[in-house]
Amino acid sequence: MSVNNKQWYGLPLNLIWGYVAIAVFMTGDGFELAFLSHYIKALGFTPAQASFAFTLYGLAAALSAWVSGVVAEIITPRKAMLIGFVLWCVFHVLFLVFGLGRANYALILLFYGIRGLAYPLFLYSFIVAIIHNVRSDSSSSALGWFWAVYSVGIGVFGSYIPSFTIPHIGEMGTLWLALLFCATGGIIALVSMRHTETPRHMQNLTTREKFAELGRAATLLYTNRSILFSSIVRIINTLSLFGFAVIMPMMFVDELGFTTSEWLQVWAAFFFTTIFSNVFWGIVAEKMGWMKVIRWFGCIGMALSSLAFYYLPQHFGHNFAMALVPAIALGIFVAAFVPMAAVFPALEPNHKGAAISVYNLSAGLSNFLAPAIAVVLLPYFSTIGVVIAYTALYILAFFLCPLIRVEQPGFTSDQHAKPFTANAAES
C-alpha cells in the first residue's frame, strides 16, 4: 500500500481529521484527570481508596492497550476506535449515575475500571493508522504530532475547561460535559477515517492465526531483548504524568492552599507545554537520533523536573507563578520520550502491530503503576517518597537506553545503527 508524502512540518495531511478527533475525544477523557482523585476523597473515601480507583483503571487500560495494536490491524483502526468510543460513553454514564452519583465505592471501581478499557482502543488504534500511512523516516515527527494533539486534549483543554466549569456547574456537571466532547470526537473519527487504509493481510488471517498474532504481542518481550528494555523505558516515561495527577492535587490543594481551579491551571500549563515539545522532540530526534534524545533529555530531564515539581512548591508555598516553573519543565522533558513510539515498530518491522501493542501495553502499565506506587508508598513516606521513587526509576531508564539496539530509518549512528536503504526503511 502507498504511504502519505504530503506533510506540514511532519503532520500527515491525509490524517489531519483523525488528529482532530483524538484532540476532541481526549479533551473529554481528560476532564477528570486532575480533580477526580480529590473529588472521590471529598465523597468520604481515603486518599488510598481514591488512588486505588486510578490503579484499577490503569490496569484495565494496560490490558486494553496491550491488544489494541493487533486488534486494530486485524479489524482496522476505524472499527477498533468505534468499539472504544461506544464502550467509553456507555460506562461513563454508568460510572456517573451509579458510582459517583450514589457514592458507592464498589460501583465506582466496577464502572470506572471497565471504562478504562475504552480509551486505549480509541487512542492507540490511531497509532496503527499513522504507522501504516506515513513513511518510516517521518514516523517520529508524525507521532510527535499525535502526542501533541493528545496533550491539547487530555491536558490543556482537559484541564483548563474544568477550571472554569467547576465553579459554575460543579464536578459532576463537568463530568457530564465530558460525554459531549467524547461523543463529538468519536463521530469525527468514524466519519473522517472511512477511507483510511491499512494492510489487508492481517484482516484475512484465520481465527487461529489472529490469536497467534495477538500472542506475539506478549512473546516479543522475551524473544527480542531490545523490545523488553524499550518496554521498561516506556513504562517509566509517563510515571510522573499519571502519578502526579493523583497525588499532587492533595498536596497543592489540601496542604499548600491552592484552589482546585489554580491547581488545574498549573496542570494545564504542563500539558500546554507538551503541545510544542512533542512536535519539537519528534523533529529533533530524526536529526539527533531517537535514543540520544530519549536518554539525555527524557530520562535526565524527567528525573530533575520531577524533583522540582515537589521541592519548588514546598519552598515557595502558595505561589502560582513559581508552581508553573516545574510544570513547564516537566512538559518539556516528558515529550523527549516521543521517539519511543517509532522505536518499537522499527525493532520488529515484520510485526509492526504486535510491536505497537507492546508499546501500548507499556503505556498502559505506566498508567497502572504510577498510582500503584502511590498507593504503596503514600501511607508510609508521604508525597516525597513517591516523588523520589519516580526519580530513581528515571535514572534506571537512563542506564537501560544504551541496551536498546535500534536501526533508525534514514539515520546513521555509530552507537545504534548502520545506514538504512530506502527499501529497508519501508520493509
UniProtKB/Swiss-Prot annotation:
UniProt keyword Cell membrane present: yes
One GO cellular component, as annotated: plasma membrane
Keyword annotations from UniProtKB, A to Z: Cell membrane, Membrane, Sugar transport, Transmembrane, Transmembrane helix, Transport
Gene3D superfamilies per record: MFS general substrate transporter like domains
Membrane-spanning ranges: 8-28, 52-72, 80-100, 108-128, 142-162, 172-192, 239-259, 264-284, 296-316, 324-344, 361-381, 384-404
Gene Ontology MF term list: transmembrane transporter activity
Subcellular location per the Swiss-Prot or TrEMBL entry: Cell membrane
Keyword Hydrolase set for record: no
Topology versus the membrane: Multi-pass membrane protein
Residue intervals on the Cytoplasmic side: 1-7, 73-79, 129-141, 193-238, 285-295, 345-360, 405-427
Parts of the chain on the Extracellular side: 29-51, 101-107, 163-171, 260-263, 317-323, 382-383
Family listed: Belongs to the major facilitator superfamily. Sugar transporter (TC 2.A.1.1) family. CsbX subfamily.
Name the UniProt record assigns to this protein: Ribitol transporter
Organism of provenance: Klebsiella pneumoniae
Lineage: Bacteria, Pseudomonadati, Pseudomonadota, Gammaproteobacteria, Enterobacterales
